[in-house]
Amino acid sequence: MWFRDPFARFYTDADFQISCDYFRGNSYDINNSPNSGFIYVKSNNKTIQFYKFWNTSRERFPGMHDQDALNKIKYDPFIKNNTGIEIRFLDTAYFGGFCQPSRDLNKVCTMHANCCVGLNNKVNDLRIMLEDWRKYMALTVDEKASKPSSWTIPQNCR
């Protein structure tokens, strides 16, 4: 769910930027847990080569979800040595999700219904999240600045 324009939060030096289930505090840390539900990519030769490599990795890891394959190949030396791609992981403070919700509604740009099994569970918690956002947006500027606001989710998605 998009709450505000995320483009100001993208890294200008990165070719490929991806949201995280869990962010470790460093956007360069390859040990971050990527979530392929939200990706910002610059179209260039590096990213084209990277996507070809990622796509063919399905042959190396048959039956594996694309996100799980990415978790395997992100350590492959081919990516750094041959593509030259600059990969950055997006901070959950701005690009949160049910795994690690953004705690500051003054910062959050997007929230993802990740770490949640079942469509009904996702829809329920997304509705709650939207209601939380509406309550936050109804606050005055002073209330937003002085009163910490956070989500009441996840509830069904735990």
What are these regions (language model features)?
Residues 41-158:
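Catalytic core and acceptor-binding pocket of nucleotide-sugar-dependent glycosyltransferases
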Residues 1-33, 38-43:
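GT-A fold catalytic core of metal-dependent nucleotide-sugar glycosyltransferases
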